[in-house]
């Protein structure tokens, strides 16, 4: 059963209600739990930070069992195109879609750039750049009002679908590198919300320890 959880932001005791579960874009339309939540704060002046959005991260821990024991399991999950994932951003101020796309694209470009020439090829790099341009173009002339939710969801084949207020915007984009770089923005070592990433990493590690391995008497776990 999905409940609404309060995530506080700002200095006036305000909060945003975030669903305890979210339907993924996988074939089973799995009802994934909230792994962790947090607040994106952006520095706009030397002594001034503003809250931009509240985020919720959703996926099925049982789908991540293969990454147990890795140095950074959460980052591995972010870059695993076979694991369906969703992030839900609820904005606490009015913003333009272009400004959101630009900010996220900067992080994606950093991730893609850091991998250039390492295990990739010119064709895949070109494809990823084209996918990024498609991503940015979706937000042209889009206005995101306070209280609006923006979700980024990937399925098991590395296809990204974006929804604003529950309605799909633009075309779905199939590019594993883009999807990985996007989710690394919140799940990687250079996360824009490090407190949430640390919490999510800890929660995932604990959850993986409780999930039996698939080869445990040949029986897998149904734990979520």
Residue ranges of predicted features:
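Terminal leader/tail segments of proteins
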Residues: 1-164, 168-224
């Amino acid at each position: 059963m999905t409940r609404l959880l309060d995530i506080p932001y700002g200095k006036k005791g305000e909060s945003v209600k975030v669903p305890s579960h979210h339907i993924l874009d996988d074939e089973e339309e799995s009802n994934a739990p909230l792994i962790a939540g947090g607040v994106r704060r952006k520095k706009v002046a030397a002594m001034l930070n503003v809250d931009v959005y509240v985020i919720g991260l959703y996926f099925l821990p049982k789908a991540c069992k293969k990454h147990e024991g890795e140095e950074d399991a959460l980052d591995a999950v972010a870059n695993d195109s076979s694991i369906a994932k969703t992030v839900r951003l609820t904005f606490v101020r009015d913003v333009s879609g272009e400004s959101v796309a630009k900010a996220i694209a900067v992080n994606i470009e950093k991730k893609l750039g850091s991998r250039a020439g390492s295990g990739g090829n010119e064709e895949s790099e070109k494809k990823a750049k084209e996918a990024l341009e498609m991503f940015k173009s979706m937000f042209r002339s889009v206005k995101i009002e306070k209280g609006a939710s923006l979700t980024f969801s990937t399925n098991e084949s590395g296809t990204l679908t974006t929804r604003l207020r529950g309605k799909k915007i633009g075309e779905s984009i199939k590019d594993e590198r883009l999807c990985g770089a996007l989710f690394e923005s919140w799940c990687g070592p250079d996360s824009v919300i490090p407190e949430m990433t640390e919490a999510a990493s800890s929660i995932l590690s604990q959850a993986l320890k409780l999930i039996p391995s698939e080869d445990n008497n040949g029986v897998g776990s149904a734990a979520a």
